[in-house]
């Protein structure tokens, strides 16, 4: 309960994230207009009409959340919370002897604390991937097809959240082949792939295949795809994301300690260890890039493995049946305690940073007073959509961050303001130190640019207004 409470307190004044605005906007238009589109990036790859390449199930669930609670930063940020609860339930169901330790390690894990309240799909994908693994285990134990169907559907659903979910689809199939379950592999693969095909529902409905292939070929998120030989080097990148920061490193050290403990105790490799190995190999081959957020996909498995190992060592030590190494066990106990201390520190650090920052609602309210209530077109930071998307057409500064990728003419301040004039923009809001990838003009930008004049400046923002004709 304390770990859950600590996690929930980090939602207080939680700062906005780039993805909160991006997926929040897509979900807003789906909820209000019935189509996934973007105003922030309207002139990019046809996204102003329709976004066909995105984390679709995340957007759909966020749109449903908006229908229930209304559009706000906190609505967008809490979509993953039910999947955190699902993950804890799955620990209870799978790790009966050690589920409380699993839940404690999970809710105290820095990377989980950080991304539970960010509009990203990895938390949900990890929970569904773990459900798929549990179902595969059940199928292997009793042979009932219903578990195979559930495994395939949950693995396919991870790919509806993010195309990287193909990692779970592939890992399940490879693990079944390893277990010589050939018929099961065929059924599982068919169900998983059939579920994944739902991803193309909107593409088929609008007969938008040309637009889809154009977007997937030019999207900055997919152009990092590399050759097969280069992907093999992804294996060498996995340790980097496992030790990326204080959010990932403590869990990595606990898992490595448990691996060492199992090796010293000469315990045979468990099915979970085999699945983790398969998952890592599939990830190395299929992932288009290595970012630390993707470690979340492994977290439930790392925790289940660590908790099972610690619980087994404790029970066998009590029975006197195992060959134990007291010093190693003691060091593992110390490591787990340090892990929990690190989790408390991470919670506190995040909460402190949140409280130090000016709340987004106040910041946007201040900017809204400058812009006014009359509907108009504004170029602004992505997060300006919260509290303003209902009134204004907002073009994101993030669009201009990618401007040079899609235009032959280099983006200079003069080109920027000419483009703003061409789009009928009335206000331009620049942020001095944006926390996301957004266009930032020179600090010595003149007070008059084209038809725009500087009307407001403070320690964070500069606002330009188009002069009346």
What are the residue ranges of the model-derived segments?
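Hydrophobic, aromatic-rich transmembrane alpha-helices
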Residues: 86-90, 176, 244-269, 274-282, ...
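Short periplasmic/luminal acceptor-recognition loop of GT-C membrane glycosyltransferases, typified by
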Residues: 357, 368-405, 417, 425-437, ...
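Membrane-lumen/periplasm interface segments of specific transmembrane helices
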Residues: 185-226, 247-249
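Membrane-interface transmembrane helices that cradle and orient dolichyl/undecaprenyl
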Residues: 93-98, 130-150, 158, 260-267, ...
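Loop-to-helix entry region of an early transmembrane alpha helix in multi-pass inner-membrane enzymes
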Residues: 56-60, 64, 68-86, 115
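Membrane-interface alpha helices of multi-pass inner-membrane proteins
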Residues: 103, 114, 147-162, 169-174, ...
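Short acidic/glycine- and proline-prone juxtamembrane loop motifs at membrane-interface regions
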Residues: 17, 117-124, 291
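Extracytosolic helix-loop segments that constitute the early lumenal/periplasmic catalytic or substrate-binding loops
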Residues: 5-6, 23-53, 57-60, 208
């Amino acid at each position: 309960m304390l770990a859950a409470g600590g996690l929930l307190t980090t939602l207080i004044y939680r700062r906005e994230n780039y993805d909160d605005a991006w997926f929040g906007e897509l979900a807003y238009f789906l909820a209000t207009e019935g189509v996934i589109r973007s105003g922030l990036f309207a002139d990019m790859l046809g996204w102003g009409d329709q976004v066909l390449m995105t984390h679709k199930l995340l957007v759909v669930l966020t749109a449903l959340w908006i229908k229930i609670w209304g559009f706000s930063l906190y609505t967008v940020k809490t979509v993953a919370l039910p999947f955190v609860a699902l993950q804890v339930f799955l620990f209870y169901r799978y790790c009966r002897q050690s589920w409380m330790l699993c839940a404690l390690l999970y809710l105290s894990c820095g990377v989980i604390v950080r991304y539970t309240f960010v509009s990203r799909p990895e938390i949900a994908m990890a929970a569904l991937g773990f459900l798929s693994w549990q179902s595969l285990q059940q199928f292997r134990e009793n042979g009932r097809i219903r578990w195979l169907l559930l495994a395939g559907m949950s693995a396919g659903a991870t790919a509806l959240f993010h195309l990287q979910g193909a990692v779970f689809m592939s890992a399940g199939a490879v693990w079944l082949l390893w277990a010589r379950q050939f018929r099961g592999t065929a059924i599982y693969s068919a169900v998983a792939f059939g579920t994944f095909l739902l991803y193309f529902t909107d593409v088929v409905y609008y007969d938008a295949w040309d637009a889809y292939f154009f977007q997937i070929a030019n999207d900055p998120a997919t152009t990092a795809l590399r050759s097969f030989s280069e992907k093999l080097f992804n294996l060498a990148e996995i340790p980097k994301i496992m030790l990326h920061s204080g959010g990932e490193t403590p869990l990595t050290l606990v898992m490595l300690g448990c691996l060492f403990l199992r090796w010293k105790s000469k315990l045979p490799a468990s099915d979970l260890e085999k699945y983790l190995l398969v998952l890592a190999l599939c990830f190395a081959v299929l992932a288009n890039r290595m970012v630390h957020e993707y470690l979340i996909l492994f977290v439930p498995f790392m925790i289940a493995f660590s908790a099972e190992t610690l619980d087994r060592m404790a029970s066998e030590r009590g029975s006197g049946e195992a060959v134990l190494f007291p010093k190693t066990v003691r060091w593992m106990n110390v490591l787990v305690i340090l892990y929990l201390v690190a989790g408390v520190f991470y919670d506190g650090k995040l909460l402190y940073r949140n409280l130090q920052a000016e709340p987004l609602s106040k910041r946007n309210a201040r900017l809204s007073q400058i812009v006014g209530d009359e509907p108009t077109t504004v170029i602004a930071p992505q997060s300006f959509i919260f509290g303003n998307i209902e009134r204004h057409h907002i073009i994101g500064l993030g669009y201009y961050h990618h401007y040079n990728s899609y235009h032959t003419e280099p983006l200079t301040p003069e080109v920027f303001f000419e483009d703003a004039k061409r789009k009928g923009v009335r206000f331009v809001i620049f942020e001095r130190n944006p926390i996301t990838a957004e266009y930032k003009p020179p600090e010595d930008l003149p007070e008059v640019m084209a038809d725009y004049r500087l009307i407001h400046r403070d320690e964070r923002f500069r606002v330009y207004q188009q002069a009346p004709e």
